[in-house]
A protein has these predicted regions:
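Short C-terminal tail/terminal secondary-structure segment
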Residues: 98, 240-265
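Conserved mid-core segment of classical short-chain dehydrogenase/reductases
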Residues: 72, 95-110, 133, 153-156, ...
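C-terminal substrate-recognition "lid" of short-chain dehydrogenase/reductases
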Residues: 121-124, 136, 217-246, 251-252
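Residue(s) in the substrate-gating loop at a strand-loop-helix junction
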Residues: 144
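Active-site helix of classical SDR
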Residues: 124, 160, 168
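Catalytic Tyr-X3-Lys loop
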Residues: 102-121, 136, 140, 157, ...
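Alpha-helical segment proximal to the catalytic Tyr-Lys
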Residues: 129, 173-177, 237
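Conserved glycine-rich cofactor-binding loop
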Residues: 8, 15-16
Length: 265
């Protein structure tokens, strides 16, 4: 029997990268998983692959986490399909652009906050009454070293993820007596977003590996998803409001991330 046997989980941004790795881990550990993903091709493919691999049910729900209605719909889809919701993983991110802080546009900042902060908060608010009624819930928010280490060029991303860390701690405190625990993972992994950024800055790939105390950036499935599994499991019942740095020690002395930033927004 898997560690999440018969549990129901929603994972956002689960079509690729860290989200797909976490969804896969949950599925092989017995969970029924909603793949909440904006890209229909990726989302459907992941749902089908996981169901075939694990034999457990999955459901793809097209989701733009920057829209409140979509966050509510993905939660409702899990309850409609399986009658409960045990685990919520807020992982999705919509992109952003590397540029100087003084050149960030209102639109770029608004988009970053909508996807990186408001979306996860809307999902948590939609999940809360269901988890409270059950007396059981696990919220895992995927944040980032970018905000912790003040990575250059990604102000809207850094700000959204640090706001989400604060919201996670607040929810953990307010919801502690209900059986809901809320925690954060700050990963260092070669995610889909990592590969997209590095495609624009290939010179930083070797530097990113070298800057990590272990000499490498982590793997989403082998390094990140086992920690998400712990935070989603019964074993996490007395752990709440924490940030787990699953990063090979990258947070210890900051980061060498220092790209040459463009002079236009």
């Amino acid at each position: 029997m898997g560690r999440l046997q018969d549990r129901v989980a929603v994972v956002t941004g689960a079509g690729e990268g860290i989200g797909a790795a976490i969804a896969r881990r949950f599925s092989v550990e017995g969970a029924r998983v909603v793949i909440a993903e904006i890209d229909e091709t990726l989302g459907r493919a992941t749902a089908e692959t996981l169901a075939a691999e694990s034999g457990n049910e999955t459901r793809f729900v097209p989701t733009d986490v920057g829209r409140k209605a979509d966050n509510e719909a993905m939660i409702a889809a899990a309850v409609e399909a399986w009658g409960r919701l045990d685990v919520l993983v807020n992982n999705a991110w919509g992109g952003g652009k590397i540029s100087r802080a003084e050149l960030k546009t209102d639109a770029l900042i608004d988009d970053g906050l909508a996807v990186g902060f408001r979306g996860p908060l809307w999902a948590m608010q939609a999940a809360f009454p269901i988890m409270k009624e059950q007396g059981y819930g696990r919220v895992v928010n995927i944040c980032s070293l970018n905000g912790v280490n003040a990575h250059m060029g990604t102000l809207e991303y850094n700000s959204a993820k640090e706001a989400l860390r604060a919201a996670t701690r607040t929810a953990a405190r307010e919801w502690a007596a209900t059986g809901i625990v809320c925690n954060v993972i700050c990963p260092a992994a070669k995610s889909a977003a990592f590969h997209r950024v590095m495609a624009e800055h290939p010179e930083l790939i070797a530097a990113a590996d070298a800057a990590n105390p272990t000499g490498r950036i982590g793997d989403p499935y082998d390094d990140i998803s086992p920690v998400a599994l712990f935070l989603a499991s019964d074993d996490c019942r007395y752990v709440t409001g924490n940030t787990l740095f699953v990063d090979g020690g990258s947070h210890i002395n900051g980061s060498a991330w220092a790209p040459d930033l463009p002079d236009e927004p």
